[in-house]
Amino acid sequence: MKQFLVVLLILSFVHGIIRVPLKRQKSMRKILKEKGKLSHLWTKQGNEFLQLSDSCSSPETASEPLMNYLDVEYFGQISIGTPPQQFTVIFDTGSSNLWVPSIYCTSQACTKHNRYRPSESTTYVSNGEAFFIQYGTGNLTGILGIDQVTVQGITVQSQTFAESVSEPGSTFQDSNFDGILGLAYPNLAVDNCIPVFDNMIAQNLVELPLFGVYMNRDPNSADGGELVLGGFDTSRFSGQLNWVPITVQGYWQIQVDSIQVAGQVIFCSDGCQAIVDTGTSLITGPSGDIEQLQNYIGVTNTNGEYGVSCSTLSLMPSVTFTINGLDYSLTPEQYMLEDGGGYCSSGFQGLDISPPSGPLWILGDVFIGQYYSVFDRGNNRVGFAPVVFYETTTNGA
């Protein structure tokens, strides 16, 4: 009888886990660079491209820097409606809303992506409220709708989401994603929309109120990574998870004890705040600190991009984040990004987040790619452990 109960518990746990394969594709930065548009983007956006105001705290509107999504390379699939309409999205722990382009959107960015057709879904319910997010110098606007959302065969009923009818500039036009699915706390959501993961919890679709993220940093691998909703994969990391308490519920915000370069504490000597964000590819920090950090690691500024010849990586120092008493080190090979042609760009970027939310550091994919990350809503904490890299051979539960 005891063995039967153990087996039953295991089966129940597996049933409540949703494994979402992540694909790794070219980032907007690489696409824009190949098309010769990157320097124009830096010039056009100016400082606003690298600033985030505290207006994101308002439930009616939000402000996001375009730079957050410029380097994102990891995407997953969802569907909305009945019959299902497919979309490629960023699973973003730095925001809380779900939005996709609407068929009524005529912006260039929309016409090049999958667009939601409410009239073709038998489960669609109109909401009609306006939706607004500011991205850099442009705005994403739309209306709210309600429909079922499916992630890897698991369907969330009555999910409120945004249908964008206008998207900013030409930047999203070159992106590999249609929309964004936010995984942050509900109080960060525009228009007080309940996030998808919160509805999964409320509708008993996941076994545990947490999720794990693995990002494969090998550019030659077909396996981009995996998002596990309702659990985490112990085979993806070594040792034990180091649990870090959330300091402010909104973003997945934590305390960083200090930041070292070559073993010497340079930044955050008295501690500082950081958010763990799958929707930001790089590691960002206050622009003054990041400029110093670029000098410490030895990269040079060329047309707004910091980098060096890849042949010099062995001469560069490691950068270490001390979090909850443990050191998380990144080698030059881990924090520098190979752009091709023997050039490597810095994985650090200046981003000024104004008070009261900031200043903040953002631990994006450059960090998460080296440390498996578990986001635990039930206990309001984040767990980290060194990633174990291996190729995925099956999609088993």
Curated annotation (Swiss-Prot):
Enzyme class per UniProt: hydrolase
One GO cellular component term noted in the UniProt record for this chain: endosome
Segments forming domain Peptidase A1: 74-385
Glycosylation-annotated residues: 139
EC number: 3.4.23.34
Keywords: Aspartyl protease, Disulfide bond, Endosome, Glycoprotein, Hydrolase, Protease, Signal, Zymogen
MF-aspect GO terms: aspartic-type endopeptidase activity
GO BP of this protein: antigen processing and presentation of exogenous peptide antigen via MHC class II; proteolysis
List of catalytic residues: 92, 277
Main location as per UniProt: other
Key word Signal present: yes
PTM field: Glycosylated. Contains high mannose-type oligosaccharide.
Tissues expressing this chain: Found in the larval foregut and adult stomach.
Annotated signal sequence range: 1-16
Pfam families: A1_Propeptide, Asp
Propeptide: 17-49
Cystine pairs: 105-110, 268-272, 310-344
Family matches, as SUPFAM superfamilies: Acid proteases
Reaction(s) catalysed by this chain's protein: Similar to cathepsin D, but slightly broader specificity
UniProt record similarity statement: Belongs to the peptidase A1 family.
Function per UniProt: May have a role in immune function. Probably involved in the processing of antigenic peptides during MHC class II-mediated antigen presentation.
Subunit text: Homodimer; disulfide-linked.
Annotated protein name in UniProt: Cathepsin E
Gene: CTSE
